[in-house]
């Protein structure tokens, strides 16, 4: 399995620190608003990476944090007339509502910055003791020039960064590149007691402290959006490696941006749609499929046309699943014939192709193409004309769902638990009864009623199949 490492700018063979186990960290949201579609991309794509690693047999410890103390949260609290804690609590709950609807599994641990204040203070103290940080008037800053590898992730020499840094004549920092580890308390802001007085942590130190606490000094994979590579991840490296004296991360993974009109979708530019807004139009399932149909490192353009393409692709997969379920219920009885057994064994080629493209930097776009190849072959073998057995249909469904589950392809609720599906089945049964009684007018009336509701019927020797138009 190969992963593209931002640090080396090339694909590298994935070798975990501990055989059979993976320690993985993803930077989570700053919880002051609903997540937008751009925020959802790393959440979905690194959920897929975690799923694939587990499918390959790894035991994955996945940590995704919440930044629950920050200038933006404080600003939102002031606007809404509530505490920062209440803002964070509200939007963490909203995050999980959206994430669950997107088919994203919860991380092993979802730590909050405010639950790790002592770990943050301890890490800052270590950096001060080692000469990598200094205190000024209750603020603590990282001494960037002391860490000579600064800029190695973003591939920017420290000299270039220094010459391009903005100089503030009133700056109390030793160097314009220095960044805050601890911020002295201001009136009306949340604070904690520390050796440097009352204050709160800076953003960058939070992730270093939480990663260190829950995953250890060196971890396998750290992932996030491309916009986090500099300065956030660069600063994490400086903090963690200076404090611990060892390599922080073995594989750095960054997803590409989602663009609108060739500009990155972001709250700061105001050109964003929340996941909830997009889901109201296209559905959460469609948003996930939209993400899966592109390689995670490629830029992705957000448009109604592309989302509708994703919706159509998802519907094709759902139709394939319902077709197999139909023949599991209505196909011939009996064991697999010799020819059927050979056919099922032949489907293993698609798992091999799927594994090959996913092993190549978890290429979900190519993986979905492989699944569609499999579907085309299955649809030929499991069709009314082929008169398939229930056993063959079940074997095909098992192999189809195994690959779909790795990507978290959303099929919606089970039709047996879908109230609308039950009503449709009842109407189909009533139509069948009318046909049996040769009441053709009533049978046609029921068919027309279902058609008007967007339900298409197909009469087959095995029974009546239906799908949504």
Give names to the regions the model predicted.
Residues 66-70, 92-95, 105-120, 138-147:
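Short, glycine/charge-rich beta-strand/loop segments that flank catalytic centers
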Residues 264, 272-469:
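Structural preference for alpha-helix termini/caps and helix-kink/transition segments
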Residues 108-111, 222-224, 390:
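Short catalytic-loop micro-motif centered on adjacent basic/acidic residues
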Residues 58, 132, 455:
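Short phosphate-binding/catalytic loops that engage adenosine nucleotides
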Residues 8-13, 17-105, 462-466:
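N-terminal, positively charged nucleic-acid-binding surface of large information/translation enzymes
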Residues 1-32, 47, 97, 118-325:
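Alpha-helical recognition segments enriched in aromatics with Gly/Pro capping
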């Amino acid at each position: 399995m190969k992963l593209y490492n931002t640090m080396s700018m090339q694909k590298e063979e994935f070798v975990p620190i501990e055989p059979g186990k993976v320690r993985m960290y993803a930077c989570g949201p700053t919880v002051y608003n609903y997540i937008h579609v751009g925020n959802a991309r790393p959440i979905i794509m690194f959920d897929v990476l975690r799923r694939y690693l587990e499918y390959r047999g790894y035991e994955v410890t996945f940590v995704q944090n919440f930044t629950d103390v920050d200038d933006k949260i404080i600003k939102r609290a002031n606007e809404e007339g509530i505490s920062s804690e209440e803002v964070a609590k509200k939007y963490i709950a909203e995050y999980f509502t959206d994430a669950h609807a997107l088919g994203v599994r919860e991380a092993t641990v979802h730590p909050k910055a405010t639950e790790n204040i002592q770990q943050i203070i301890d890490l800052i103290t270590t950096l001060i003791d080692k000469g990598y940080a200094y205190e000024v008037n209750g603020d603590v800053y990282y001494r960037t020039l002391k860490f000579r590898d600064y800029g190695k992730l973003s591939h920017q020499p420290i000299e270039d960064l220094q010459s391009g840094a903005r100089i503030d004549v009133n700056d109390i920092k030793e160097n314009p590149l220095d960044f805050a580890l601890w911020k002295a308390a201001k009136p009306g802001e949340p604070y904690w007691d520390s050796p440097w007085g009352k204050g709160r942590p800076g953003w960058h130190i939070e992730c270093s402290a939480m990663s260190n606490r829950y995953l250890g000094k060196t971890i396998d994979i750290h992932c996030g959006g491309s916009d986090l590579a500099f300065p956030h991840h660069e600063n994490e490296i400086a903090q963690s490696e200076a404090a611990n004296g060892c390599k922080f991360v073995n594989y750095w993974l960054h997803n590409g941006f989602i663009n609108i009109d060739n500009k990155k979708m972001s709250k700061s530019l105001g050109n964003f749609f929340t996941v909830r807004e997009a889901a109201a139009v296209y559905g959460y399932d469609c948003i996930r499929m939209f993400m899966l149909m592109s390689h995670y490192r490629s830029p992705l353009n957000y448009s109604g046309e592309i989302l509708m393409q994703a919706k159509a692709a998802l519907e094709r997969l759902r139709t394939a699943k319902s077709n197999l379920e139909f023949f599991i219920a209505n196909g011939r009885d009996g064991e697999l014939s010799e020819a059927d057994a050979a056919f099922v064994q032949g489907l293993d080629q698609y798992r091999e192709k799927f594994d090959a493209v996913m092993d190549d930097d978890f290429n979900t776009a190519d993986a979905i193409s492989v699944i569609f190849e499999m579907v085309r072959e299955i649809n030929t073998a499991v069709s009314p004309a082929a008169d398939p057995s229930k056993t063959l249909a079940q074997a095909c469904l098992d192999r189809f769902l195994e690959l779909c589950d790795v990507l978290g392809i959303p099929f919606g609720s089970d039709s047996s638990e879908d109230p609308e599906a039950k009503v449709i089945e009842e109407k189909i049964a009533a139509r069948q009864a009318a046909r049996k009684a040769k009441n053709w007018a009533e049978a046609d009336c029921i068919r027309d009623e279902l058609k008007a509701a967007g339900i298409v019927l197909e009469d087959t020797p095995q029974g009546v199949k239906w799908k949504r138009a």
